[in-house]
């Protein structure tokens, strides 16, 4: 296993031995790869667990520290914005659910090490009603696609308001995924959690929902923008929430129905053999051939 993936495993809490010191050039490659895949904050957690003699050169260590602090500060800021946005919709009569982003970051042992982007929020009410509300709030037409609209409510944080969580660009499976999300819709808008440091509550998906939704989102990236390791690590922590055998079978049933079971088996290989996810958290039997192909595709992509 190369040093990058060893460090990734250490960052995820696994015990890994480094037999040889890592050269300064190799550390630079690790840092660049971490930035490309938006996992630099997570890998900094791993670096802090290494003996001092195995850590990066001082100059790179300081650069990494500064980046990790910026990631931490942005997470804290977006947590506040997510709570503010959730409360704004609630006061105006709309229930909501934060997709990905800050909702997933809370699953990390260090919720501030995940590199965040914009705020994706699913708002109850349907496309016409929600768009009418958003347009009324801004006072002008919004940039909109079938399933979401850009909502420039903040100058310092991008917000996408989703009318439905399913993306019509998802290959093969849009209507089936939409059917799945519809079947669990009430639970998602009722599932609220407290964010770190008592900043407030947001709605987030249930584990049962996220096991399908997040994998479908990754699947869409597989055919379009490319997959980054941040998405793979997100799914690692989603799976580590655990499930009963009955819940696993229900998830597998839906994966087969929406024609993502083959992709799920490839993902289980990556989760188990690359990230070190324990067998008890795997949804199905890993597929080595498809998993190696998926891993190659991931490393050619990036966030």
Each predicted region: which residue ranges?
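Conserved NTP-donor binding/palm subdomain of two-metal-ion nucleotidyltransferases/polymerases, i.e.
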Residues: 1-117, 122-303
């Amino acid at each position: 296993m190369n040093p990058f993936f060893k460090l990734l495993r250490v960052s995820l809490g696994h015990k890994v031995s480094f037999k040889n010191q890592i050269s300064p050039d190799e550390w630079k490659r690790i840092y660049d790869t971490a930035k490309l895949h938006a996992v630099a904050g997570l890998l900094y957690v791993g670096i802090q667990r290494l003996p001092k003699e195995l850590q990066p050169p001082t100059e790179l260590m300081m650069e990494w520290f500064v980046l990790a602090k910026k990631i931490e500060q942005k997470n804290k800021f977006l947590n506040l914005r997510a709570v503010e946005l959730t409360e704004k919709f609630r006061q105006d009569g709309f229930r909501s659910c934060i997709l990905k982003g800050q909702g997933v970051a809370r699953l990390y042992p260090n919720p501030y090490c995940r590199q965040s982007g914009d705020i994706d929020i699913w708002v109850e009410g349907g496309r016409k009603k929600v768009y009418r509300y958003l347009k009324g709030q801004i006072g002008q037409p919004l940039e909109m696609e079938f399933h979401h609209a850009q909502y420039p409510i903040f100058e310092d944080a991008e917000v996408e308001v989703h009318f439905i969580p399913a993306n019509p660009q998802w290959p093969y499976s849009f209507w089936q995924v939409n059917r799945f999300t519809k079947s669990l819709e009430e639970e998602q808008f009722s599932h609220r959690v407290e964010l770190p440091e008592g900043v407030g509550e947001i709605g987030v998906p249930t584990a049962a929902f996220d096991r399908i939704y997040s994998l479908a989102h990754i699947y869409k990236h597989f055919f379009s923008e490319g997959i980054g390791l941040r998405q793979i690590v997100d799914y690692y922590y989603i799976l580590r929430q655990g499930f009963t055998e009955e819940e696993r079978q229900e998830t597998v049933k839906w994966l087969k129905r929406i024609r993502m079971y083959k992709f799920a088996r490839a993902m289980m290989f990556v989760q188990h053999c690359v990230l070190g996810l324990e067998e008890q958290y795997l949804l199905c039997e890993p597929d080595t051939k498809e998993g190696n192909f998926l891993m190659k595709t991931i490393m050619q992509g990036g966030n």
